[in-house]
Amino acid sequence: TTTELDIDRGWSPVPMAAFGPHVLTIGSMSKIAWGGMRLGWIRAEPGIIARLLAVRPSFELGTALLEQCIAIELLDDMPALLGHVRERLHAGREAVAAGVARMDGLAMPTTPGGLSTWLDLGAPISTRLARSAREQGLILPPGPRFALGGVLERRLRIPITLTPERTAVAMDRLAAAWTAVRDRTVDDALPLQPTAVI
């Protein structure tokens, strides 16, 4: 979940598991600390946790001890870790907003937290813009990669997790891609190859 990744609302929601004995919520260190840290947790009532623990050995090989030790250290000082993460996300969000402000026709919604923002392109051109961005050396998946039936063709997902310096470079490339799309100089015949999602 990204519940812990609030940037500036200043409140901590009650975990969904608090609203009923049959609700499970899942958290992850990969969202809070580092994407390569594949550790998480489940919040649920003790009986459900006991049943999950009973079947766990049948489908899991275990988690690396080093990562578990690192997670324990990080969890011991979660407020400081989350403070650092909020500062980083705030800086990344501001860098994206500064880049978007230079591109006529793009809109960035209020983004109070999370790892990314979804730009409103104003038209169903996300795939064309992703193709144009690739020509500028910027790999971004088009909106429909995240939904069925072309639903997000008017949106483009932009991460707010990078440093302001790296984000500024990415936004410069996106601006060049945006200009090419608006000037209709993008080769629509060029196939958009599968890419890793960033």
What do these predicted ranges mean?
Residues 24-87:
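Conserved core segment of the aminotransferase class I/II
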Residues 23, 106, 138:
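Short, conserved active-site loop motifs that form the nucleotide-linked donor/cofactor pocket
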Residues 43, 118-122, 159-161:
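Short hydrophobic/aromatic beta-strand micro-patches
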Residues 2-32:
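Active-site pre-lysine segment of PLP-dependent enzymes
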Residues 72, 89-97, 107-120:
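Conserved glycine-rich beta-strand-loop-beta hairpin in the small C-terminal domain of fold type I
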Residues 135-136, 150-198:
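PLP-dependent enzyme catalytic core of the Aspartate aminotransferase-like
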